[in-house]
Protein backbone atom coordinates (compact mmCIF):
# COMPACT_ATOMS: atom_id res chain seq x y z
CA UNK A 1 0.00 0.00 0.00
CA UNK A 2 1.20 3.50 -0.80
CA UNK A 3 0.55 6.68 1.12
CA UNK A 4 1.16 10.03 -0.58
CA UNK A 5 2.27 13.11 1.34
CA UNK A 6 1.96 16.23 -0.86
CA UNK A 7 4.34 19.19 -0.51
CA UNK A 8 2.56 22.51 -0.12
CA UNK A 9 5.48 24.93 -0.13
CA UNK A 10 8.79 23.38 -1.20
CA UNK A 11 9.22 23.91 -4.95
CA UNK A 12 11.89 21.21 -5.29
CA UNK A 13 9.86 18.40 -3.75
CA UNK A 14 6.34 17.60 -4.92
CA UNK A 15 5.46 14.75 -2.56
CA UNK A 16 6.64 11.70 -0.67
CA UNK A 17 5.18 8.25 -1.28
CA UNK A 18 5.49 5.65 1.46
CA UNK A 19 5.81 2.05 0.21
CA UNK A 20 6.52 -1.17 2.09
CA UNK A 21 10.19 -1.12 1.06
CA UNK A 22 11.13 2.53 0.72
CA UNK A 23 10.25 6.18 0.81
CA UNK A 24 9.84 7.55 -2.71
CA UNK A 25 10.41 11.30 -2.99
CA UNK A 26 8.94 12.92 -6.11
CA UNK A 27 10.50 16.16 -7.29
CA UNK A 28 8.74 19.08 -8.93
CA UNK A 29 10.63 18.38 -12.19
CA UNK A 30 9.03 14.90 -12.40
CA UNK A 31 12.08 13.04 -11.09
CA UNK A 32 11.95 10.60 -8.20
CA UNK A 33 14.34 9.16 -5.66
CA UNK A 34 13.85 5.88 -3.78
CA UNK A 35 15.33 5.58 -0.27
CA UNK A 36 15.13 2.15 1.42
CA UNK A 37 13.89 2.37 5.02
CA UNK A 38 17.22 1.03 6.32
CA UNK A 39 18.96 4.07 4.82
CA UNK A 40 16.44 6.53 6.24
CA UNK A 41 16.89 5.77 9.93
CA UNK A 42 16.98 2.90 12.42
CA UNK A 43 13.54 3.86 13.74
CA UNK A 44 12.01 3.73 10.27
CA UNK A 45 13.79 0.48 9.45
CA UNK A 46 12.07 -1.15 12.45
CA UNK A 47 8.73 0.68 12.16
CA UNK A 48 5.48 -1.02 11.25
CA UNK A 49 3.66 -0.25 8.02
CA UNK A 50 1.09 1.75 9.96
CA UNK A 51 3.82 3.83 11.63
CA UNK A 52 5.48 4.57 8.28
CA UNK A 53 2.19 5.44 6.56
CA UNK A 54 1.50 8.22 9.07
CA UNK A 55 4.17 10.39 7.42
CA UNK A 56 3.49 14.13 7.40
CA UNK A 57 5.38 16.62 5.25
CA UNK A 58 6.39 19.64 7.33
CA UNK A 59 4.62 22.93 6.55
CA UNK A 60 7.91 24.30 5.20
CA UNK A 61 8.27 21.32 2.85
CA UNK A 62 11.79 20.65 4.08
CA UNK A 63 11.13 17.63 6.28
CA UNK A 64 8.98 14.59 6.90
CA UNK A 65 7.60 13.74 10.36
CA UNK A 66 6.42 10.31 11.51
CA UNK A 67 4.35 11.10 14.65
CA UNK A 68 3.81 7.51 15.79
CA UNK A 69 7.56 6.96 16.20
CA UNK A 70 8.51 10.64 16.79
CA UNK A 71 10.94 10.70 13.85
CA UNK A 72 11.80 13.78 11.79
CA UNK A 73 14.05 13.74 8.73
CA UNK A 74 15.06 16.52 6.36
CA UNK A 75 14.04 15.81 2.76
CA UNK A 76 17.25 17.19 1.18
CA UNK A 77 19.65 14.71 2.83
CA UNK A 78 17.19 11.87 2.17
CA UNK A 79 17.14 12.69 -1.53
CA UNK A 80 20.94 12.91 -1.69
CA UNK A 81 21.25 9.48 -0.04
CA UNK A 82 18.71 7.82 -2.31
CA UNK A 83 18.75 6.18 -5.72
CA UNK A 84 17.37 8.01 -8.75
CA UNK A 85 14.38 6.19 -10.21
CA UNK A 86 13.65 6.61 -13.90
Predicted feature locations:
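Motif-centric detector for short Cys/His coordination patterns
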Residues: 1-86
Amino acid sequence: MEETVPSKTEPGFAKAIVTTRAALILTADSGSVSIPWERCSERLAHATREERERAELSPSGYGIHWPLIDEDLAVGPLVRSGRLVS
